[in-house]
């Protein structure tokens, strides 16, 4: 997604949007490595378009002006897109390389995830402590070539059977 498209979404939205739109916006922002924008979209979705029980009701339940719609049909796709948006913030592998914490908001200093799946039959776990990546664990279920963008600022150690770099 190019910057022009991202700016267009921000400029023309959200009058005709529903809650689902914010979940998908979070995915788009995460894919563009905009963690702050992704978190903002998810926050709006949760605060304005979810009922107290966590169900997604397409219209703006808070009447905050985040949508021109206020109706209450229950749908699941907004919640599923929300979960996808969080995962895209934590881990991405769609471009042929694995990126750990590619779209983390600036105020998320301590974050971890366990056993998220990446393309290529890889299972990834990672930790961020005080804003620095402290652990990345990748398990290959089928073998094959691992391409990982180095998330570490300094020295690191690779442990495992094959260590070709």
What does each of the following model-derived ranges do?
Residues 22-35, 89:
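Alpha-helical support elements that line or immediately flank enzyme active sites
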Residues 7-22, 31, 66-76:
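Solvent-exposed loop and edge beta-strand segments that line ligand/cofactor-binding
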Residues 1-5:
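Conserved small/polar residues in nucleotide/adenosyl-binding loops
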């Amino acid at each position: 997604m190019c910057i022009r498209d991202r700016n267009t979404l921000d400029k023309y939205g959200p009058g005709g949007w529903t809650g689902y739109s914010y979940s998908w916006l979070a995915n788009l922002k995460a894919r563009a490595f905009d963690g702050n924008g992704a978190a903002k979209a998810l926050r709006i979705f949760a605060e304005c378009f979810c009922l107290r029980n966590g169900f997604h009701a397409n219209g703006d339940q808070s009447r905050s002006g985040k949508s021109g719609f206020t109706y209450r049909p229950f749908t699941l796709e907004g919640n599923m897109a929300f979960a996808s948006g969080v995962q895209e913030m934590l881990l991405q592998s769609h471009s042929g390389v694995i990126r750990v914490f590619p779209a983390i908001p600036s105020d998320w200093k301590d974050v971890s995830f366990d056993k998220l799946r990446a393309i290529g039959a890889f299972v990834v776990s990672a930790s961020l402590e005080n804003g620095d990546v402290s652990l990345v664990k990748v398990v290959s279920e089928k073998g094959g070539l691992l391409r990982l963008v180095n998330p570490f600022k300094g020295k690191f150690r690779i442990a495992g059977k094959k260590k070709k770099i």
